[in-house]
């Protein structure tokens, strides 16, 4: 998530970078405990197999912190929008959700996120009454996720399209 979010310019990429580094420290401490303390060191080296830092098929020489990317936040709150299953980001313009069908009856998400510092308000509007949205308005400091589904009882048979607008 860190690298994807960094490519998208999300400020939350920095949270994931910190978390990766924290968990690497925890893993190192757990390995040391297992090797030196547990059962008086009886199992030393049993948990020392290299398991962090793989970037290709061959085994690295030692564990290493996975590469993380940090984002420099923009100086003002800036909205970014990304839909489930797509790396593309749009501050405005068109993005498409996956196709809905009444057999799976699943929902898809849209992330509204900040690329800068501060907060911004957003509103969600739909052009069709059968579009079911989990959140119609909100305030974003880092990110907010909305879920989009279909109320199949309000929809006529056949293929149809609807438009969802996200604006500040």
Label each residue range with its predicted role.
Residues 107, 119-123, 161:
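Exposed beta-strand and adjacent loop surfaces of beta-rich binding modules
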Residues 40-44, 116-118, 138, 162:
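Glycine-centered flexibility motif
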Residues 115-147:
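Surface-exposed binding patches on compact interaction domains or structured appendages
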Residues 105, 143, 157-161:
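Extracellular Ig-like/FN3 beta-sandwich strand-entry sites
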Residues 110, 148, 156-168:
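A short beta-strand micro-motif common to beta-rich folds, especially ectodomain repeats
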């Amino acid at each position: 998530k860190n690298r994807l979010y960094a490519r998208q310019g999300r400020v939350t990429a920095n949270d994931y970078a910190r978390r990766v580094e924290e968990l690497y420290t925890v893993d190192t401490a757990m390995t040391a405990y297992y090797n030196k303390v547990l059962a008086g060191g009886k199992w030393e080296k049993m948990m020392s197999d290299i398991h962090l830092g793989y970037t290709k098929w061959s085994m690295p020489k030692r564990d290493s912190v996975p590469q993380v990317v940090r984002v420099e936040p923009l100086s003002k709150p800036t909205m970014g929008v990304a839909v489930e299953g797509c790396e593309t980001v749009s501050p405005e313009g068109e993005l498409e959700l996956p196709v809905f069908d009444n057999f799976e009856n699943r929902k898809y998400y849209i992330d509204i996120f900040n690329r800068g510092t501060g907060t911004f308000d957003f509103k969600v509007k739909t052009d069709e009454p059968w579009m079911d949205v989990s959140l119609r308005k909100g305030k974003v400091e880092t990110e907010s996720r909305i879920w989009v589904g279909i109320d199949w009882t309000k929809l006529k048979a056949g293929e149809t399209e609807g438009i969802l607008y996200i604006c500040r």
